[in-house]
From Swiss-Prot:
Belongs to the phosphofructokinase type A (PFKA) family. ATP-dependent PFK group I subfamily. Prokaryotic clade 'B1' sub-subfamily. It comes from Hamiltonella defensa subsp. Acyrthosiphon pisum (strain 5AT). GO terms for molecular function: 6-phosphofructokinase activity; AMP binding; ATP binding; fructose-6-phosphate binding; identical protein binding; metal ion binding; monosaccharide binding. GO terms for cellular component: 6-phosphofructokinase complex. Its cofactor is Mg(2+). Its EC number is 2.7.1.11. ATP binds at residues 12, 73-74, 103-106. It is found in: Cytoplasm. This is ATP-dependent 6-phosphofructokinase.
Length: 327
């Protein structure tokens, strides 16, 4: 039976991570188990930055953005000798289970710890990109969405005043969920996402068609890394003869107090992770990730959640249909 549970946050931070940490800590203590915080992700696990936590360690953090445990990217964790040192550190503290809050890379690290060290590991999806399979939504997605929509609303004010085209670059890496949701909620006229092939000439045709119908201004949302939006802005202005301005929202999307849904989702996921760990049999090493599907908590093997095929199946085509209908 699991006696000591560790918790860490890894990769890019997301609003709601603190709520998840709180959920893990309070639920572990409720089950009369001990809980340890691991600072600065896998880097901290490697450096043995591990400290026992109590219920007061997580007081007044549910409303705070970021992560009190800190986070770091630690590519050296791909090396087996570094993972061996991390496992040794866990064993030295008597930690036999670990909750990892993060994205795909964090999940992959957790799976290796389970395989190589016999550590029970549960992953919680903590990323604003919403690009983790096995869950409808990840912790932080809805807070980031609110941030992006508020920015779009402000840009629309100035775009309409100057009859201008605005291009808004949104985070997401290779996933267009945040861009797509923001475009729908912000009433944007055009959307460019990784899941749909991008044709600049086709975009110009659509913009000109809107102008011909009397459209005075427009907002274009685009997922990061698709193209250089400064160059795209110049191209659109040249082809349409309309003033065009790019805006990169950047890391502001990761910050801020989490919205209510993210706080609830993170709390539920944290509690569910502990429930899975407490119920697990030591003979069968647990390596799974938690998600919400159709409103209910679910779990699946980490290997399934980080597979390319499952990530492709996650794309919200119904959202794209709505967007195309409304635009």
């Amino acid at each position: 039976m699991v006696k000591r549970i560790g918790v860490l946050t890894s990769g890019g931070d997301a609003p709601g991570m603190n709520a998840a940490i709180r959920g893990v800590v309070r639920s572990t203590l409720f089950k009369n188990k001990e809980v340890f915080g691991i600072y600065d992700g896998y880097q901290g696990l490697y450096d043995n930055q591990i400290q026992q936590l109590n219920r007061y360690s997580v007081s007044d953090i549910i409303n705070r953005g970021g992560t009190i445990l800190g986070s770091a990217r630690f590519p050296e964790f791909t090396q087996k000798e570094n993972r061996a040192r991390a496992i040794k550190n866990l064993n030295s503290h008597g930690i036999d289970a670990l909750v990892v809050i993060g994205g795909d890379g964090s999940y992959a690290g957790a799976e290796l710890l389970a395989k190589e060290g016999g550590i029970h590991c549960v992953g919680l999806p903590g990323t604003i990109d919403n690009d983790v399979a096995g869950t409808d939504y990840s912790i932080g997605f809805f807070t980031a969405l609110q941030t992006v929509v508020e920015a779009i609303d402000r840009l629309r004010d100035t775009s309409s005043s100057h009859q201008r085209i605005s291009i808004v670059e949104v985070m997401g890496r290779h996933c267009g969920d945040l861009t797509l949701a923001a475009a729908i909620a912000g009433g944007c006229e055009f959307i460019v996402i990784p899941e749909v092939p991008f044709d600049r000439k086709e975009l110009i045709t659509e913009i000109k068609a809107g102008i011909a119908k009397g459209k005075k201004h427009a907002i274009i949302t685009i997922t990061e890394r698709i193209c250089d939006i400064n160059e795209l802005s110049q191209y659109i202005e040249k082809e349409t003869k309309r003033e065009t301005r790019p805006t990169v929202l950047g890391h502001i999307q990761r910050g801020g107090a989490p919205v209510a849904y993210d706080r609830i989702l993170a709390s539920r996921m944290g509690a569910y992770a502990v429930e899975l760990l407490v119920q697990t049999d030591h003979k069968a090493i647990l390596s799974c990730c938690v998600g919400v599907q159709n409103g209910k908590m679910r779990h699946a093997p980490i290997s399934e959640c980080i597979s390319i095929d499952n990530k492709r199946q996650k794309f919200k085509e119904d959202w794209l249909d709505v967007a195309n209908t409304l635009f």
